[in-house]
Amino acid sequence: MASKDEILAGLAEIVNEETGLETEAVQLEKSFTEDLDIDSISMMTIVVNAEEKFDVTIPDEEVKNLKTVEDAVNFIDNAQA
């Protein structure tokens, strides 16, 4: 099971691969859409890659609730438990 720091680092790598954003730009308080400028198609790719990386399921109806990086980290952390 990954720690929250490991989840954040893993998400940063996934966002970097999908968008080209520097991993340092992916911080807990950042909004996926407003701060990181991630569109819905890229977000779905990020979600699928996160599901594979962390061996969790993120239901489609939950994706809209993942507004910030911290939301995603917390969801993945809870889903691993």
From Swiss-Prot:
Name the coiled-coil region(s). none
User: Major place of localization?
Assistant: cytoplasm
Looking up Pfam families in the UniProt record yields: PP-binding (PF00550)
Q: Which domain of life is it from?
A: Bacteria
Any one GO MF annotation of this record: acyl binding
What are the annotated GO cellular component locations?
cytosol; membrane
Show the InterPro entries listed in the entry. Answer: ACP, ACP-like_sf, PP-bd_ACP
Locate the Carrier domain: which residues?
2-80
What's a GO biological-process term for it? lipid A biosynthetic process
Q: So, what pathway does this thing act in?
A: Lipid metabolism; fatty acid biosynthesis
Q: Does the keyword Secreted apply?
A: no
In-chain residues carrying the UniProt-annotated modification O-(pantetheine 4'-phosphoryl)serine: S40
Keywords tagged on the record: Cytoplasm, Fatty acid biosynthesis, Fatty acid metabolism, Lipid biosynthesis, Lipid metabolism, Phosphopantetheine, Phosphoprotein
Keyword Cytoplasm carried by entry: yes
Query: Could you tell me where this protein is found in the cell?
Result: Cytoplasm
PTM text: 4'-phosphopantetheine is transferred from CoA to a specific serine of apo-ACP by AcpS. This modification is essential for activity because fatty acids are bound in thioester linkage to the sulfhydryl of the prosthetic group.
Note the Gene3D superfamilies from the entry: ACP-like
Per the record, the similarity remark reads:
Belongs to the acyl carrier protein (ACP) family.
Protein function:
Carrier of the growing fatty acid chain in fatty acid biosynthesis.
The protein depicted here goes by the name Acyl carrier protein
